[in-house]
Amino acid sequence: MKRLVGVLMILGLMLTSWGLLGSPQTAIAASLSPLSFNPSPVLAEQQFRNAMDDKLATDFGKKIDLNNTNVRAFMQYPGMYPTLARMILKNAPFESVEDVLKMPGLTDTQKEILKNNFSNFVVSPPLDALVEGGDRFNNGIYR
């Protein structure tokens, strides 16, 4: 009985594999006649622009944008990192550079540091690419 079951299983396996592998699959090629291939004319070429390229062409690349820059950019100015930088990020957006002096909880020393660095600051509208998520606080660059 075991031998009969074994023979039937082998026979069934051979018939199944012959059925799957034995019949060739026909390929259907696409017709590339001139009537079916109609290229559409290009009416106008659109140039794609990255919003960050436009932003870097402004003062953003040279100065600290108070509404868009991350906390690590403040490290280059003494007295700004980390306390003042964190306060600026938490209280942004600002309408003008002078608005940073209106932040609550500033000491006189911190106000002097901010006033001395006004020439290093610029204010522009916040861009979603720069302010979404936690990238302003931790942009993932560790040196």
Swiss-Prot record:
UniProt gene name: psbU
Keyword terms: Electron transport, Membrane, Photosynthesis, Photosystem II, Signal, Thylakoid, Transport
Cellular compartments per GO CC: extrinsic component of membrane; photosystem II oxygen evolving complex; plasma membrane-derived thylakoid membrane
Organism in which the protein naturally occurs: Leptolyngbya laminosa (Phormidium laminosum)
HAMAP family: PSII_PsbU
Propeptide, chain numbering: 30-44
Keyword Transcription part of the UniProt annotation: no
Family of the protein in this entry: Belongs to the PsbU family.
Name this protein carries in UniProt: Photosystem II extrinsic protein U
Binding partners and assembly: PSII is composed of 1 copy each of membrane proteins PsbA, PsbB, PsbC, PsbD, PsbE, PsbF, PsbH, PsbI, PsbJ, PsbK, PsbL, PsbM, PsbT, PsbX, PsbY, PsbZ, Psb30/Ycf12, peripheral proteins PsbO, CyanoQ (PsbQ), PsbU, PsbV and a large number of cofactors. It forms dimeric complexes.
Topology relative to the membrane: Peripheral membrane protein
Signal peptide: 1-29
GO BP annotations listed: photosynthesis; photosystem II stabilization
Subcellular location, record wording: Cellular thylakoid membrane
Primary subcellular site in the record, as a coarse category: membrane
Superkingdom to which the source organism belongs: Bacteria
InterPro entries (UniProt xref): PSII_PsbU
Pfam families in the cross-refs: PsbU
Gene3D superfamilies in the record: Photosystem II 12 kDa extrinsic protein
